[in-house]
Amino acid sequence: ICNRQGVVSDVNPYFNFCLIPGFHTPDWAKGAVMYQIFVDRFYNGDKTNDVVDGEYTYIDEHVTQVRDWNKMPASMGVREFYGGDLQGVMDKLDYLQDLGVEVLYLNPIFVSPSNHKYDTQDYDYIDPHYGVIVKDGGDVLAADDRENAHATKYIKRVVNMKNLEASNAFFAKFVEEVHRRGMKVILDGV
């Protein structure tokens, strides 16, 4: 049988998929051309919000900024950041429209330490590394330091309310522009 655990022989009903009675796919989604975007890997439109080498630790190692976009990701590539952001997606809206895209499906964009953002820490705010960093500063971690309490640059970037509010405001502007073009946005909110 197949459920949320994949193909299994020992069935636990907790993991069974369920249908929501009365749910209907919206008409706008039927037959729409959808384009899924892993924001960090799409396009770097604002270099001021890029994660920098050693900004913080994720899964016991420092994060790194990838400078060669043609480089193959490491096996633990969740710590490698290419710098893609929402400004980059906005910059490429003409290109996406020319492809015939009608719906942008964005991988998670909320505050999270990984590049894929599937381990969201705060669903109320867009991650400033994808949005806007207006208040910056602090220090990156020393080479032998793995303690995020010392990652003052990261803390300032993702905790400062001005950064969080500016990132949310930028996202609202982004969605307005997408809608102005007759397109839709779907957020992956795991």
Label each PLM-derived region with a short phrase:
Residues 8-190:
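Acidic/aromatic-lined carbohydrate-recognition and catalytic surfaces
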Residues 1:
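Short, aromatic- and glycine-rich surface loops/edge beta-strands on solvent-exposed regions
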